Design a protein with these regions (language model features):
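Secondary-structure boundary elements
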Residues: 87-89, 118-126, 159-167, 219
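Pocket-lining segment of extracytoplasmic ligand-binding domains
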Residues: 144-242
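Short helix-initiation/N-cap motifs at beta->coil->alpha
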Residues: 25-37, 89, 130-162, 258, ...
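Secondary-structure end/capping motifs
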Residues: 211, 217-290
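Short hairpin/turn module used for nucleic-acid contact or packing/dimerization
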Residues: 282-311
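Short, glycine-/small- and polar/acidic-enriched structural segments
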Residues: 4-122, 129-136
């Protein structure tokens, strides 16, 4: 299995937790391209972009099946940036602008576009989207309404935004504050907005999901649940460590932030499992359909191995 060096995976990485019946070797990879490892079928299990996996639900070219372990979650309010000279004073000003994305299928962009449309009235059809690539799966093609321009990757979205070639960008990079004088957050008060968004929706946006080779779970269906249980146990140990850290952490206000998070999100803020996360998965599937990643709206039950639907 390969995944990033996450605290919630630490007990699996160091072998403290072992999935029942499985001799698991974990290879930690923190490079940005680690998610492409499944394309060569190199690993039996791997974290992968959820948006791309959803786009492949019709084609099934990846050869992997998801379980409801959402390896990475992140709010994306703070990953939407603007050029200060673009005249973008509010999200509504993005209509008709040129907005950069790394790839149309990237889960970060799916959530950010959905957020901007649902909460702030963005019309995606009015925007010219500037992408490094439009890599798809199977015979996937961009929707007919999509106005998209592909720029050479070496031009870099950061430089395009800084130089005013694009007006805004949705990215995974930390480009503000104080990184470049011409770049700023669309939402400078992103922390308060993220708290409000979570309180209203209960969503902590899913980015990466754990996939297992379809050939493995077809031969041994029990593997899906064994891996699910092991990841849950690893997360439990992570929570125990974070609680201990609140009075030992080097960070100045970690205890206050930890206690605030517990008050707002409860004792299990990093939700995994099917039942409790179904509304959020359904919203992501809705966004994927609206944005042309899928030709129909899939149901959450179609996304995961059947043995995990009772979790």
């Amino acid at each position: 299995m390969t995944c990033g060096p996450y605290d919630r995976a630490r007990a699996l990485i160091d072998g403290t937790v072992k999935p029942q019946g499985i001799d698991l070797e974990v290879r930690v990879n923190k490079s940005p391209g680690r998610h492409t490892k499944i394309e060569g079928k190199e690993f039996d299990a791997a974290e992968f972009y959820t948006g791309t996996y959803i786009a492949d639900l019709h084609y099934k070219t990846l050869g992997y099946t998801a379980i409801p372990i959402f390896v990475k979650r992140m709010f994306r309010h703070s990953y939407i940036y603007v050029n200060k000279r673009a005249g973008v004073r509010s999200p509504g000003d993005l209509n008709g602008k040129r907005i950069g994305v790394q790839n149309w299928l990237t889960t970060t962009a799916v959530w950010a576009r959905g957020l901007l449309e649902d909460e702030y009235g963005l019309d995606p059809k009015s925007v010219t989207w500037i992408a490094d690539r439009v890599s798809g799966v199977g015979d996937w093609k961009p929707p007919a309404w999509l106005k998209i321009e592909i720029v050479p990757k070496e031009q870099k979205q950061f430089n395009l935004l800084a130089n005013g070639v694009i007006d805004a960008a949705i990215t995974t990079g930390t480009w503000a504050p104080n990184v470049h004088p011409e770049i700023d957050f669309l939402f400078p008060n992103y922390a308060a907005l993220e708290r409000d968004y979570f309180k209203r929706t209960g969503f902590f946006p899913i980015m990466h999901t754990l996939l297992i080779k379809t050939s493995v779970v077809e031969k041994d269906p029990w593997v899906a649940r064994s891996m699910y249980d092991a990841w849950q146990e690893s997360k439990k140990k992570c929570y125990e460590w974070l609680e201990w850290q609140r009075v030992h952490q080097t960070g100045l206000w970690y205890r206050a932030l930890w206690e605030e998070e517990q008050t707002i999100a409860g004792q299990d803020p990093y939700l995994w499992g099917f039942r409790k996360t179904r509304p959020e998965v359904d919203k992501l599937l809705e966004y994927c359909h609206r944005q042309g990643l899928t030709t129909r709206k899939f149901e959450p039950e179609e996304m995961f191995h059947p043995s995990t639907l009772e979790t």
